[in-house]
């Protein structure tokens, strides 16, 4: 027996989400149906609101509904220390440690020549423009400890060291090939505390 076309369309769209296969998409679709029109409307409104209202912070490139974002507006943050991360989930992981009181810069990826991702595909130019406008003392490179993250860290070091900046790398403690997003808070806090100069 085939499912109704509207259900099939919903399953097809949900299955496009990362980590969601067809069976999980089908379970989610039936959950939405069971929850009722109110829930479905709220979910649709939340999705539409994210697409409509969320944009990049003009300073750090994180996702925000206000520009500049809350972290960039916070006068208690050390504006002279910038933690460079690959993505917003990495920023959130570092924030959960409550160990870093500087500001951030989100690259939105890592260098990956095999995948066709070069420096111009990342928010590196925006970082350089930001540093001209707002000088910093230290750049903490917190890219993932994998081949792409290491390549990105080395590339950033070669760009930033000649500018007279102290460039540090978070200490290894996060396993090689792992993502910051999935690291526990203690491991990530130790990695931040043990960062090293590049």
From Swiss-Prot:
Sorted UniProt keywords: DNA damage, DNA recombination, DNA repair, Metal-binding, Zinc, Zinc-finger
Listed GO biological process terms: DNA recombination; DNA repair
Chain positions of all zinc fingers (C4-type): 57-72
Gene3D superfamilies for this protein: 3.30.60.80, 3.40.1360.10, 6.10.250.240, RecR Domain 1 (1.10.8.420)
UniProt domain Toprim: residue ranges: 80-175
Record bears the keyword DNA damage: yes
An example molecular function term from Gene Ontology annotations: zinc ion binding
Pfam family membership, one: RecR_ZnF
InterPro entries, alphabetized: DNA_Rcmb_RecR, Hlx-hairpin-Hlx_DNA-bd_motif, Rcmb_RecR, Rcmb_RecR_Znf, TOPRIM_dom, TOPRIM_RecR
Family: Belongs to the RecR family.
Record-linked NCBIfam families: recR
PANTHER family: RECOMBINATION PROTEIN RECR
Function: May play a role in DNA repair. It seems to be involved in an RecBC-independent recombinational process of DNA repair. It may act with RecF and RecO.
Protein name (database record): Recombination protein RecR
Organism in which the protein naturally occurs: Anaeromyxobacter dehalogenans (strain 2CP-C)
